[in-house]
From Swiss-Prot:
Source species of the chain: Cytophaga hutchinsonii (strain ATCC 33406 / DSM 1761 / CIP 103989 / NBRC 15051 / NCIMB 9469 / D465)
SUPFAM superfamilies: P-loop containing nucleoside triphosphate hydrolases
Official protein name in the record: Lipoprotein-releasing system ATP-binding protein LolD
Highest taxon above the source species: Bacteria
First-tier enzyme category under EC: translocase
The keyword Nucleotide-binding appears for this protein: yes
Assembly, per entry: The complex is composed of two ATP-binding proteins (LolD) and two transmembrane proteins (LolC and LolE).
Known function: Part of the ABC transporter complex LolCDE involved in the translocation of mature outer membrane-directed lipoproteins, from the inner membrane to the periplasmic chaperone, LolA. Responsible for the formation of the LolA-lipoprotein complex in an ATP-dependent manner.
Chain sites annotated for binding ATP: 37-44
Amino acid sequence: MQEILKAGDIFKTYGTVDVLKGIDFSVQQGEVVSIVGASGAGKSTLLHILGSLDRPDTGWVKIKDEEISAMNDKTLSAFRNQHIGFIFQFHNLLPEFTAVENVLLPAMIGKRNLKEAENRAKDLLRFLGLDHRFTHYPNQLSGGEQQRVAVARSLINDPLIVFADEPSGNLDTHNAEELHQLFFDLRKTYNQTFVIVTHNEKLADLSDRKVVMQDGVII
């Protein structure tokens, strides 16, 4: 398998608190990797640095041989839009937009061909079981459906890698298990790569690899 992400010697301090203490991390294309550990272990901070939402104090991050940690803000923003997807605990769908329109937003920001993007948005929503929800607004969707729209949005630009931070944290057991299965369906169909921070042991155990963090280090 091809290495899609590699990071080395990642340190991060907030004030006087050392949050990350020399992290080395790598992911292969098509892998589903979970990051687990107690609250305060540094999981979300690491995810945000790997996904370019934050910068390390020292160390480096490469995605497909591009050193994103060395990019300026403008270059990094364009790279993030084109190659990185994100899913968070809260779906952050815009209430005034339909499901399809919400999915399209990253493609519109990236100035992609709108017709092609709309076709992909509908294909993704169909794959995620939402073909009957194209024109529904977020307040007309269940919690599980809202999060599936957020998953489709993360995939609209065909990213190299998707980072998910507690993606099922707000869902009941049934919807959480359905969402977890979708990650593996997406990997099987699209060879999609996922790095997932989770407290859900079932999801962590399903993953190809479980990375355990404690006090800012991988153990």
